[in-house]
UniProtKB/Swiss-Prot annotation:
Top-rank lineage group of the source organism: Eukaryota
Regions crossing the membrane: none
Ranges in coiled-coil conformation: 482-510
Compositional bias (Basic and acidic residues): 267-280, 332-342
Name under which the protein is recorded: SH3 domain-containing protein 21
Limits of the SH3 domain: 65-126
CDD domains: SH3_D21-like
Polar residues composition-biased segments: 41-54, 343-365, 439-456
Signal peptide boundaries: none
Residue segments, region Disordered: 1-56, 142-303, 332-479, 528-549
Length: 549
């Protein structure tokens, strides 16, 4: 109120001076006649000029068709009859903002009209006027963005149409856009193919390499069939690749492949000088074992023939060899591949050095064709034990592979008895290398020095002594195989029991989680209802408190 009174006093004095200004001039009369004419126009013109300059620039001060409503801040008591009385909180309609005096507006309040000072009133907030402008700007912004984006996407089509329509030459103009259109999709397709189809192209290249390697191996095997003397030297490169892959992947099909290829190569130069009939039989075994398309089912007869030769030729070496092979294969997996490589490198030295190879290495003591069955069975044992020790969770795939190998080993046992009577009368009288193989393990087992036995190699007179001793060796090898199969079955049973326990635990955990989810879903609406009830209760309490006050 003190500020309003201070502001009112100078304004009231000014309006009084302005209203009484003519009386003072008339009182002076003729005393100031010379001064009056220049003073009166100057005193009248400045307010006109000030009104013109004051009215023209701002638009909000002009009269508007829709009158504004202002709220009164301070009480105002009129001092002149044309002034309007104001009370705090009243609403005043502004009729005009241009009046004779600066800072005075004309308005209407409670059915009365008059002039009032503008600083006693608050105009409506300008935010209300700006709200529609902001909404329009927000709506127009995405429209502009879409307009900007559309021409970019349609630029290539527009350029093609313009190039096709504007060019006067018929043949030339038609050739250029078609050439561009043919070039562009090729570039795009190449680019997209390199970016998007980068993944599937790489396996294609790898597949082509593997096909080339398979073709190379097949061609090398055909060359071996044509020239048996040069066979071992050419087969050095494909066999280490085949032996490295099974060590990493542990696939049952690829493991016996190098053994099958290397088995018939060792006896080829040994048996070639003795008779001409034997290489023909060996070529048939090469065809069976060397083809890259052979599967496990196709390789069973080759293994059976190998087992028949072993059963016929060796008396006491079979159980010893099995005992020697088992610990090394259980500990080291990569030794058979290295030993097979040694078998392939050794034949270059000559036929006299070949009997020396069985003495230092245990895997090479197997004369040619007996190695694949213990390798496959014992490697499966290694896999099963590794699964028990380190990774019990990875079980289903390996159980299936172990069972397949077990079934695979059981089938040759039944076939061995049938094929013994057929294989022995054909090969034993013709092959004279049998006693040579029998002499080697008997003398090389106690002493590794074999040069004394090399002179005894060409003696072919001990062949008939093998016939009565063959049934003695077969039950031992069968018993060993049955022991291996029983151990495999026991390990598979243990794995299955562990898997069943894991399944039970997982089912229990899943059941617990499912029950927790159900309880949460049941509790969530109850919690929401409780929260709503609390809010409504608090709201009712606040209402009652306000009513009591």
């Amino acid at each position: 109120m003190v500020q309003s009174e201070l502001q009112l006093q100078p304004r009231a004095g000014r309006r009084a001076d302005a209203s009484n200004w003519g009386d003072f001039g008339s009182d002076k009369g003729g005393l100031g006649n010379t001064d009056i004419p220049p003073i009166t126009p100057n005193s009248q013109r400045p307010p006109k000029l000030s009104n013109l300059t004051y009215d023209s620039p701002p638009d909000y001060l002009r009269t508007v068709s829709c009158p504004e409503t202002c709220r009164v801040l301070f009480d105002y008591q009129p001092e002149a009859p044309d002034e309007l009385a104001l009370q705090k909180g009243d609403l005043v309609k502004v009729l005009r903002k241009t009046t004779e005096d600066k800072g005075w507006w004309e308005g209407e309040c409670q059915g009365r009209r008059g002039v009032f000072p503008d600083n006693f009133v608050i105009p409506p907030p300008p935010i209300r006027k700006l709200i529609p402008r902001k909404i329009i700007s927000r709506e127009s912004a995405p429209i502009k963005e879409t307009k900007k984006l559309m021409p970019k996407s349609s630029l290539p089509t527009v350029k093609k149409l313009a190039a096709a329509a504007s060019a006067p030459g018929r043949a030339k103009t038609l050739s250029t856009p078609s050439g561009d259109s043919q070039k562009r999709p090729s570039r795009n397709s190449g680019f997209n193919g390199s970016c998007l189809n980068g993944g599937p192209r790489q396996p294609g290249r790898k597949g082509s390499r593997t096909q080339a390697s398979q073709q190379h191996s097949a061609s090398s095997q055909e060359d071996e069939q044509k020239s048996p003397g040069k066979g071992p030297s050419r087969s050095k490169t494909p066999t280490p690749e085949k032996t490295r892959l099974p060590d990493k992947v542990l696939a049952p099909e690829t493991i016996p492949a190098p053994d099958k290829v290397s088995i018939p190569k060792d006896p080829v130069p040994k048996k070639a000088p003795d008779s001409d009939k034997i290489p023909a039989t060996e070529d048939t075994t090469l065809d069976k074992a060397g083809t890259p398309e052979s599967t496990l089912s196709g390789n069973k007869p080759a293994k059976d023939e190998a087992l028949d030769l072993k059963m016929a030729l060796h008396e006491d070496t079979a159980p010893a060899l099995v005992k020697i092979l088992t610990p090394e294969h259980m500990i080291f997996k990569k030794e058979p591949s290295r030993d097979n490589d040694q078998c392939q490198h050794l034949p270059q030295g000559g036929s006299t050095q070949r009997p020396e190879s069985p003495a230092p290495s245990n895997n090479i003591q197997v004369p040619g064709e007996y190695s694949p069955p213990p390798d496959s069975s014992e490697r499966s044992c290694c896999r099963v034990r590794q699964v028990n020790g380190s990774f019990p969770a990875q079980s289903k795939a390996e159980d299936v592979s172990a069972m397949e190998e077990a079934n695979f080993l059981e089938e040759p046992l039944a076939k061995d008895e049938r094929t013994l009577n057929k294989a022995l009368p054909k090969k034993l009288p013709s092959e004279r290398a049998g006693p040579q193989k029998q002499v080697l393990p008997q003398e090389s087992a106690p002493t590794p020095q074999v040069p004394h036995t090399i002179q005894q190699m060409p003696v072919p007179e001990e062949a008939p002594t093998l016939h009565p001793l063959t049934p003695l060796t077969s039950p031992k090898s069968k018993n060993d195989r049955m022991d291996v199969l029983e151990s495999l079955k026991e390990e598979v049973g243990l794995l299955r029991s562990r898997l069943e326990l894991l399944e039970l635990k997982l089912e229990q955990k899943m059941g617990d989680v499912w029950e927790e989810l159900k309880t949460e879903t049941l509790l969530s609406p109850e919690v929401q209802m409780m929260q709503r009830n609390r809010k409504s209760f608090k709201h009712a309490e606040t209402q009652t408190e306000t009513q009591t006050e």
